Structures are given as structure tokens and as C-alpha cells.
Amino acid sequence: MRFSIFFKVVALFMITLFSFGAFAYYFVSSQISHENYQNEMRHYQFVTTINEILNNYSDYRAIEDYLYKIGFRETTIENLEKVLAKRRHQLHHRNIGYAEVFKFSDMVFILLKKDEHFVLYKDLHSVSYRNYFLAITVGLLLILFLFLFVLQSLLPLRELRSQVKPFAQGDKSVSCKSKQKDEIGDLANEFDNCILKINAMNESRVLFLRSIMHELRTPITKGKILSSMLKEELSCKRFSSIFDHLNMLIEQFARIEQLASKNYGSNKEKFLMSDLIDKIEKMLLIDEDKESPIHVSSSNYIIEADFELFSIALKNMVDNAIKYSDDKQVFLDFIGNNLVVSNKSKPLKEDFEKYLQPYFKSSNPSQAHGFGLGMYIIKNALEAMGLNLSYHYSNGRICFTIHDCVFNSFYDLEEDNEELPPPPPKI
């Protein structure tokens, strides 16, 4: 379970607040109990002293002076009559003076029997717990201030997060500039600088690619115009085919660039395998008059993918399979919903994941060649369409499997009376 940093800060604040409250309650309770015990012992000491004076000297003047010094004053409280009634009855049976201490409504009194009447003295010293509660209040305010201070310091993280998400989704107009003078502010400003640099690099890259494509298309267009003026029909067709192929390569280059920069929008559709093979043969400039090195178990299967992107991926797979096979042949078979591309060759010497890296070179001198950008393009193209690629070696063949790309077969569609999708435009 994942928790945000704000949740953790709030949870920490609540735990701190609860711990402080428990500690404050325990501390104040123990202090109050201790002070009450000390006051009780002090008052009983007063009464003991007064009773000794009465027993030995019966000097009421000295007792009054003593009570005055320790902070007791004579008082009369009418609402204490019922409380004192029982004590008066007990004190009437004593022949000599007697003093007793008691509490009433959080006030301390000393009841003194003086001859045949009673005098009530009240303790003017009041017990105050204001300092304890003041300390608790200051502690709570300090914890609250620290919590708000930390929370305010972390708020730019939420704003930075809200800016990072649109930037990751392709919005290059976000700004993360911060005036905060701490680590979070530095992080936001560095990220803002990074956005500016990335935008500048993207603009430079787009300008560079557009310039190259423009400079390449201009001579290609001129070449096509000049080739159309040739009188010999065969030469005219050959030159026209060459320029068409160059133009197609430029378009492929643009799609590959979009794919590498994660700016390509995949558009899945259904198309026949035969149409896909026709386009791949034209992309590889395979002569129609000669036997094709591409062997398909059946051309009646229907593929569900982005036609242009899938053709680029499969073209690179077929090209590598022909180039590195022992017999310069490649085989396309269908197993369930998977398309298997295989050729006769020795198994890969390195881990398959290494071949997916751009310009990978084998460490084995006997296999010093690599696949260039081919496998890298294949991997990214298939991932853009949500397809997976796997490798295995079986019966003397290297087999690459594209999973879950086969929709159905043409015959199955005819049995289900489904309408066949129109073929994609041919080049």
C-alpha cells in the first residue's frame, strides 16, 4: 500500500500530538498529586503545632499570630454550617481547645475550638496550575506551528507533481519555476531548467529533421520528373521505382523518429497478411520476376495492428532473417494468435535482451556482426502497439514470435459472415 508524503506528515503529526498529550496528562497529574500531598502534610503539620500550643500553653493569642503568619484568616461562611455541625458536636465533648483541618470546595480551613465557641480560619494561599497549562498550550502551539511549517514547505512538491504529469504526457508548455529558497525550490528550478533544455533540444531536432527531409525530397522530386522524361520505358520504370523507394525510406525514417521520441500515435486496424507481404517485398526491393525468399504458410490470415508500424517492424525482422540465415530464406508461420518469423541459423550467442539494444555487437569474434537498429526498432514498434516479442531456438531455426497479433483467418471470417476490412493503400 502506497502513502503520499503528505499523509505520512499528517500521520506523524497526529502521533506526535497524541504522544505529547499523553505525556502532558501524566506529568500534570503526577505534579498535582505530589503538590496536594505536600500541602496536606503541611496543613497537618500546622494543626499538630496548634494542638501542641493549646495542650501546653492554651495561648490563643500565639495561635492567632501563628495562623496569621502561615496565611490563614478568620472567616465566617454560612453555607458551611451543615458541614461544621458534625465537627462542632465532636469538639463540644473536648474540655480543652482543639484544632482540625479540612477541605471544602477546594478550599482549606482550620476549625479551632476556643473556650466554648468555634472560630473558622481560611487558607488564603491558592493552588494554581496555570503554569502547567500554559506550558502545555505553548507545546501544542509549537507542534502545530512546526506541522504547518513543514506542510507549507512540502506544498511545492504537490505543484511540481501536477506539472510533471502533463509534461510526461507530452505537454511541453509547463513551468516549474519556484521562489522557495530550499532544497525543494532548487529541485523545482532545476526541473524547470531541464524542461527548457528538453524543449530546445526537441525544437532543434525537429528543425534538423525537417531540413534533412526537405533537402532530400527536393532532389528526389527532381529525379522523378527527369526520369519521367526518359524515352526508354524500362529505364523510366526503374528510376521511378528507385525514387519511390527513397521517398518511402524518408517516410519510414520520419515514423521511426516519432517512434523513438514516443510521439507516434498507434492506430490499430485489420488487414490481410497478403497485403502486408506485398508491402514488405516492395520495401525490400525484392524482384517480382524472381522467387521470393519470404515463405508464408498462409496469406489468408488477418493481422490486427497499425499497418505502417507493423510493416516497418516485420520488414526489419525479415531483412535480418534473410541477411543472417544460412540459406537466405525466411519463414512466416502462424501458431494460434501468434506470428512466428524463423530462419535457418545458429542460435544467438548472447542474451536476447542484448540484441534489442541499438548497434549491439556480439563479443564473439566469429559473430562480430550485430543487428544495427533493426531489433531496437522492432522492439519499440511492437511495444507502441502493445505487442510482445519473444525468442527461442528449435530444430536448427532461430524463431522470433510476435504474440497476439493475429486476429483471425480469412476462411474463419467467411464462415462467420463477417465483412472483410478493406486493404490498406499500397505504395
Swiss-Prot record:
Do the record's keywords include Transcription regulation? Answer: no
Q: Effect of knocking it out?
A: Deletion leads to a decreased urease activity to one-third of the level of the wild type. Displays also an exacerbated stress response that results in enhanced and accelerated biofilm formation.
- MF GO annotations: phosphorelay sensor kinase activity
Q: What InterPro entries has UniProt attached to this entry? A: ArsS-like, Bact_Sensor_His_Kinase, HAMP_dom, HATPase_C_sf, His_kinase_dom, HisK_dim/P_dom, HisK_dim/P_sf
Q: How is it modified after translation?
A: Autophosphorylated.
Q: Where is the HAMP domain?
A: 151-203
Q: Which SMART domains match?
A: HAMP, HATPase_c, HisKA
> Domain named Histidine kinase: which ranges?
211-398
Regarding the membrane, this protein is recorded as: Multi-pass membrane protein
Q: Which UniProt keywords apply?
A: Kinase, Membrane, Phosphoprotein, Transferase, Transmembrane, Transmembrane helix
Transcription among keywords = no
List every position bearing Phosphohistidine.
214
List all membrane-crossing ranges.
3-23, 131-151
Q: What is its EC number?
A: 2.7.13.3
**GO CC terms, sorted:** membrane
Q: Which reaction does it catalyse?
A: ATP + protein L-histidine = ADP + protein N-phospho-L-histidine
Entry's localization field:
Membrane
List, alphabetically, the Pfam families matched.
HATPase_c
Q: What does this protein do?
A: Member of the two-component regulatory system ArsS/ArsR that regulates genes involved in biofilm formation and acid adaptation by acting on major ammonia-producing pathways. Functions as a sensor protein kinase which is autophosphorylated at a histidine residue and transfers its phosphate group to the conserved aspartic acid residue in the regulatory domain of ArsR. In turn, ArsR binds to the upstream promoter regions of target genes including ureA, amiE and amiF to positively regulate their expression in response to acidic pH.
**What name has this protein been given in UniProt?**
Sensor histidine kinase ArsS
The organism is: Helicobacter pylori (strain ATCC 700392 / 26695)
